[in-house]
Amino acid sequence: MRKALGVFLSSMLAVSVLAGCGASTGAATSQNTEEAVEAEVQAVDANEMLSLWNENAEARQQLISYMEAITKEGGPDYIPVENRIAVFDFDGTLFCETDPNYFDYTLLVYRVLEDPEYKDQASEFEKMVANKIVDQNTNGTKYEELPVEHGQAVASAFKGMTIDEFYAYIQEFKKLPMPSYEGMTRGGGFYEPMLQVIDYLKANDFRVYVISGTDRFICRGLMLNSPLELPNYQIIGSDESVVSAKQAGEDGLNYTFEQGDDLYLGGEFIIKNLKMNKVAVINKEIGIQPVLSFGNTTGDAAMANYTIGKNPYKSLAFMLCCDDLERENGKLSKAQDMYNLCEEFNWIPVSMKNDWKTIYADGVTYIGKKAAEPAAEEAEEPAEEQVEEPAEEEEALDNAA
């Protein structure tokens, strides 16, 4: 397709030059023809790269129009390549959000309550946290302290593993089936239309970062050997400590890493990467204000507002709305809340039901929520007034945005 368009472009330019050789009007015609054909080439490329989006989707049209504007050199909205930064939430934005809970929550439950090599060693605290997650899954019980407790339990339950061992553990967990779907494993829940968006951005010289509330190393392990190809330094999440094998509890200020030493998970939870913490980590680790933001909950509101607020460049914030009940674990009340917030804060809504031709990879069939619905509904209850002054409970439970 691109080769054919290139031939077409060359032929059109040749015709315009022959028709107007030596004349200023001919030169203008040539320039106009070139611009028109270049615009057509770009439009066709967008159609190809966003083929899983319905053509009448407003979010798709806005993204394409935006890309045409910011990549036109000399245009008023042109953005230099070094400033083309896009940030994405993970759970519910790029990947199946809950089934019956977040990936990192189900990973902890498996480690503490089911893993035959660890469950007998699990601490009482880890068991308490895992059972809270199970209770939330089955009964929808709210635990406002759960996000921090979960982070602490993950850190302690995997303490002593090397980073590579942790990644390998996650690879095995990814092979387990996703309970509400046929043909999909725990690691296969990527949203295909959003993967196309990332490829489209990369093709237009964007650097893409994942800014997740999920543990940084869990995110990296989940994306390892997956359809989403990003380097680890562009995958940012909640943090836990890392130590040297020979450090023996000594403070890092007093210990020098030795050649040939190994790094291990240190067992200490540091920070949950949600809300304002997302803005802070973007500033600290990227150092450039993003021009595109993609999220799905109020946990991503700060990141969205940071992207479009006081930005010297043209910027947009997109929010996914989980309004599809036929193809995935949709939640209509949550989707409507997000539509309302998008209208209030000038974010662009993405309808999973109406904007996408498909959600998951070929061969995946949604067979029902089973135990997923109570946890998912109770885990996130965005409300308009909570964007500016989020309630403590909502901040706690909106935990993997």
Stretch-by-stretch model annotation:
Residues 3-4, 11, 53, 156, ...:
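A generic helix-loop boundary/linker signal
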Residues 5, 19, 91, 212, ...:
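Short glycine-rich loop/turn motifs that provide flexible caps or phosphate-binding loops at active sites
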Residues 1, 27, 381-382:
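Disordered, low-complexity tails and leader-like regions
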Residues 18-36:
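Sec-dependent signal peptide cleavage junction
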Residues 35-50, 165-209, 213-401:
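C-terminal cap/substrate-recognition subdomain and adjoining C-terminal extension
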Residues 2-24:
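Sec-dependent N-terminal signal peptides of Gram-positive bacterial secreted proteins and lipoproteins
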Residues 38-251:
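Alpha-helical substrate-recognition element adjacent to the catalytic core
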